[in-house]
């Protein structure tokens, strides 16, 4: 019998103590160091975590940009979160499992897990883990038990391919096109696109740089 996946979580009451918000918050420095502290994290069976509203599952949500474009894809049936199937997304990432916990990690796996998730989801091998925002959406059942951490990554070329069946038709689209009509996006992507200028500005302030284009 296959062992059930165990995913990284923290108690919702911790979020309530820090200050509830709905949507996207740029105050990542207030939340991330606390909710990723080793003493505050635990791993739960995913089936239980999806139903237990006492906990929030930590989800890295990475925006990948290249030459004025952003990576967009459609959530396919191969993705584990059936409630998002068919929706467009600009965020790469997913649940951090106990297997993602680095042997010598002192953060119980968030930063190690974020890098591993990105390598598994798309063909991207090197990632800086600068976070620019956090996301909470208590308006939906799926959002109530998840907590997103937004990262911005710039790549030198568009040679990024989806490695999982849950990523359908990945393509880089101009930023203006991506933000023009957000009706077909999942809620977390809508939040990011609505605040995209602020996210990119914060990324620049934090030192996330645009790489030079590779020479052919």
Predicted segments with their positions:
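Nudix hydrolase/Nudix homology domain
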Residues: 2, 86-102, 133-135, 143-216
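A short coil-to-beta-strand element that immediately follows conserved catalytic motifs
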Residues: 125-133
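A short, structured loop/turn motif at beta-sheet edges
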Residues: 67, 122-126
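Acidic, metal-coordinating catalytic segment for phosphate/diphosphate chemistry
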Residues: 22-69, 75-81
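Extreme N-terminus nucleophile/cap motif
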Residues: 2-36
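Conserved Nudix-box catalytic region and its N-terminal flanking loop in Nudix hydrolases
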Residues: 69-116, 120
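Residue-level detector of short, conserved catalytic/binding motifs and their immediate flanks
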Residues: 58-61, 110, 149
């Amino acid at each position: 019998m296959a062992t059930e996946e165990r995913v990284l979580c923290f108690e919702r009451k911790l979020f309530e103590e820090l200050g509830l918000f709905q949507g996207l918050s740029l105050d990542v420095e207030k939340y991330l160091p606390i909710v990723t502290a080793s003493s505050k994290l635990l791993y739960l069976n995913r089936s239980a975590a999806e139903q237990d509203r006492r906990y929030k599952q930590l989800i890295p949500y990475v925006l990948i940009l290249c030459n004025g474009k952003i990576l967009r894809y459609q959530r396919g049936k191969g993705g584990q979160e059936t409630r998002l199937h068919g929706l467009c997304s600009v965020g790469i990432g997913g649940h951090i499992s106990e297997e993602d916990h680095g042997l010598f990690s002192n953060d119980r796996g968030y930063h190690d897990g974020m890098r591993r998730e990105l390598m598994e989801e798309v063909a991207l091998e090197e990632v800086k883990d600068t976070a620019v925002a956090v996301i909470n959406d208590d308006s939906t059942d799926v959002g109530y038990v998840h907590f997103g951490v937004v990262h911005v990554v710039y790549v030198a070329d568009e040679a990024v391919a989806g490695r999982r069946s849950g990523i359908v038709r990945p393509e880089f689209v101009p930023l203006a096109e991506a933000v023009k009509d957000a009706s077909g996006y999942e809620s977390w992507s809508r939040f990011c696109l609505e605040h995209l200028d602020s996210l990119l500005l914060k990324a620049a302030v934090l030192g996330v740089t645009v790489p030079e284009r590779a020479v052919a």
